[in-house]
């Protein structure tokens, strides 16, 4: 869980990194992009409804984790062929389609503690109403294609993406995406290493950084 101050800190950090990376790219509608993110729930939304970073502010936190992981991978691999600007764009915006995608609700959940007033095979507990998230109805979502296609389209509305940037966003989920699994991922990752690096950075964030 993140505090309100941590959520705000992540928002400021995200915008600062994005501005620094895009300051010299021609054709960028940077202020429009920031306005679109700020007027949506991007900075307070979860990254998922059941799994990684499924809490308020989780989407922005996850995006920053992916950014940090991607920069670490590039440094570790000593790969100077990948442009820092491109790496920043795909890391911060690979999940941008998750803005306005989830909605909060409250569900009853067993909270186990030594002071619980009820008891089952796992121990003492009480029922408490806790914040949770679910997918919005499809008529309330932006739908262009699948998750990756939606993200690439939204990013492209504000940033003239290179081919490698588009491919990285489109294939950041690797074989976990049904659509991507039908493509020749090995050839894609060989030809466009940024796509592979982004996939690895995303998996590390999801299954390591946000699973502690």
Feature locations, PLM:
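Acidic/His-rich, divalent-metal-binding segments that scaffold phosphate/diphosphate chemistry
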Residues: 1-120, 125-127
């Amino acid at each position: 869980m993140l505090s309100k101050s941590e959520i705000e800190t992540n928002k400021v950090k995200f915008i600062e990194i994005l501005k620094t990376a895009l300051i010299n790219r021609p054709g960028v509608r940077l202020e429009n992009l920031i306005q679109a993110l700020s007027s949506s729930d991007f900075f307070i939304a979860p990254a998922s409804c059941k799994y990684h970073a499924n809490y308020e502010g989780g989407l922005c936190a996850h995006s920053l984790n992916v950014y940090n992981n991607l920069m670490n991978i590039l440094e570790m691999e000593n790969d100077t062929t990948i442009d820092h600007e491109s790496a920043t764009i795909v890391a911060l915006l690979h999940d941008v389609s998750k803005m306005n995608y989830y909605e909060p609700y409250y569900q009853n959940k067993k909270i186990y503690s030594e002071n619980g007033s009820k008891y089952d095979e796992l121990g003492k507990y009480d029922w408490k109403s806790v914040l949770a998230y679910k997918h919005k109805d499809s008529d309330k979502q932006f739908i262009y294609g699948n998750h990756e296609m939606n993200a690439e389209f939204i990013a492209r509305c504000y940033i003239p993406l290179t081919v490698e940037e588009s491919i990285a966003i489109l294939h950041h989920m690797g074989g976990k995406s049904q659509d991507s699994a039908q493509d020749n991922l090995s050839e894609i990752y060989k030809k466009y290493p940024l796509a592979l690096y982004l996939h690895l950075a995303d998996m590390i964030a999801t299954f390591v950084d946000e699973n502690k």
